[in-house]
Amino acid sequence: MNLTYKVHPIKTRYQGWTNYCYIIEDIVSRSAIVVDPSWELSKITTTLSELEAELKAVALTHSHYDHVNLVDPLTKMFNAQVYMSKKEIDYYQFRCRNLISLDDHQTISIGNTRAQCLLTPGHTAGGMCYLFSESIFTGDTVFTEGCGICEDDGSSAEEMFDSIQRIKSEVSPHVRVYPGHSFGKSPGHSIKDLYQHNIYFQIDKKEYFVKFRTRKNQKGIFDFK
C-alpha cells in the first residue's frame, strides 16, 4: 500500500517529563499535522523547516498540560487549526485559538491524508485517538507497554477498558501505534505487538482490568524514557 503520509516522531523533554509528539506530513501537498506538541518548540519548528512542510493543524488527544503546552505558540506562528474531542472540551472547559471540536467517527484531513477520530475516554473524560491508514496516535490511552492512569478528574478505569476493547476490535493488527509516552520501547510498534507485550491488551474481563489498573502502590508509572 502506498502511503500518502510520513510520520516523524519527536521526543521532547522538560525537567522530569519525557513526551512524544508527532508530525504527520502529507507527501504530495507538504502540509502537516502535529499531534500533542509539547515542551521543545524548536524541535518542532526545525523539523517542519527541514521537511519544507507547512503546519496546517494541531491534533490533541487530550487536554493535560504536557500534551498541549505548545498550542499557543504554534497557533500564533502558523495560524493552525486545533482539533480536540467535543467531550474533552466541554468537560474541562479547554480553550485555545482556532479550536475545532470533534465528534466520534469524524474525519480530519490534510492534503490527500485522512484520519478517523476515535473517542477513547478513560485517562480523561474525552480522550481521542487519531487513526490514519497505517498508524494510530493514542496519546495517554495506550502505550506500547501499558495504558494511561485512571486517577484524575474525569478518569475511569471502566471506560479505559472499553476504549482498549474498541481499539482491539476496530484497529487492524498491522497498524502502528504512536503513543504520547514510552517506558523504553520506541514508538511505532504494531497492534499485534501490543497483544503480545501489553498486559492491558491481554485482560478481557472488565472486573479484572479495573482491579489491576487501580491497584495500590504502583511503581514507575511516570518513569517515561
Swiss-Prot record:
The keyword Hydrolase applies. Belongs to the metallo-beta-lactamase superfamily. One of its GO terms (biological process) is antibiotic biosynthetic process. Its cofactor is Zn(2+). CDD domains: BaeB-like_MBL-fold. Zn(2+) 1 binds at H62, H64, H123, D140. Keywords: Antibiotic biosynthesis, Cytoplasm, Hydrolase, Metal-binding, Zinc. Gene3D superfamilies: Ribonuclease Z/Hydroxyacylglutathione hydrolase-like (3.60.15.10). It is found in: Cytoplasm. It is an enzyme of class 3 (hydrolase). Probably involved in some intermediate steps for the synthesis of the antibiotic polyketide bacillaene which is involved in secondary metabolism. It comes from Bacillus subtilis (strain 168). This is Probable polyketide biosynthesis zinc-dependent hydrolase PksB. PANTHER family: HYDROXYACYLGLUTATHIONE HYDROLASE GLOC. One of its GO terms (cellular component) is cytoplasm. Pfam families: Lactamase_B. Zn(2+) 2 binds at D66, H67, D140, H181.
